[in-house]
Amino acid sequence: MGSLKLVCAVLLCMMVAAPVARASLTCPQIKGNLTPCVLYLKNGGVLPPSCCKGVRAVNDASRTTSDRQSACNCLKDTAKGIAGLNPNLAAGLPGKCGVNIPYKISPSTNCNNVK
């Protein structure tokens, strides 16, 4: 009986001390966060505050190299699929929102080089 209590106590300590896994954003979540940006990326004009909120959310969730590379690949693939996308507006979007990302949002970006 005493050894069962010890095993339970050890397991409980392991569960409490284990690091909590943080889920990364999925590509559909990234696209959802950036949907308010599409009209701006095509036509320019006024940048919606909801767009910058989405840009910040994606940046905040992209903490590791793997997260940033995944976000980059999602943005790259999404940019390829938006007819009429202005590449200069896409590349400048993070800066317009006060966010610094380590890559250019472009269909030609090599996301494997993102750190």
Swiss-Prot record:
Example GO BP: seed development
Tissue: Expressed in seed (at protein level). Expressed in seed.
Temperature dependence of activity: Resistant to heat. At room temperature no effect in protein secondary structure by varying pH.
Family as reported in the entry's similarity comment: Belongs to the plant LTP family.
A GO cellular-component term linked to this record: extraorganismal space
Keywords: Allergen, Disulfide bond, Lipid-binding, Signal, Transport
pH effect on activity, per entry: Stable at low pH. Refolds at pH 2.5 after thermal denaturation. Thermal denaturation is irreversible at pH 7.5.
Described function: Plant non-specific lipid-transfer proteins transfer phospholipids as well as galactolipids across membranes. May play a role in wax or cutin deposition in the cell walls of expanding epidermal cells and certain secretory tissues.
Quaternary data: Monomer.
Entry GO MF terms: lipid binding; nutrient reservoir activity
Secretion signal, residue range per the UniProt entry: 1-23
Highest taxon above the source species: Eukaryota
Protein name: Non-specific lipid-transfer protein Cor a 8.0101
A Pfam match: Tryp_alpha_amyl
Practical and industrial applications: In order to protect patients that are allergic to hazelnuts, it is extremely important to find ways to detect trace amounts of hazelnut in foods that should not contain it for the food labeling and safety purposes. This protein is used in the development of these methods. For the detection of hazelnut, a liquid chromatography tandem mass spectrometry (LC-MS/MS) method in selected reaction monitoring (SRM) mode is developed by using a selected marker peptide from this protein as standard.
Disulphide-bonded residues: C27-C74, C37-C51, C52-C97, C72-C111
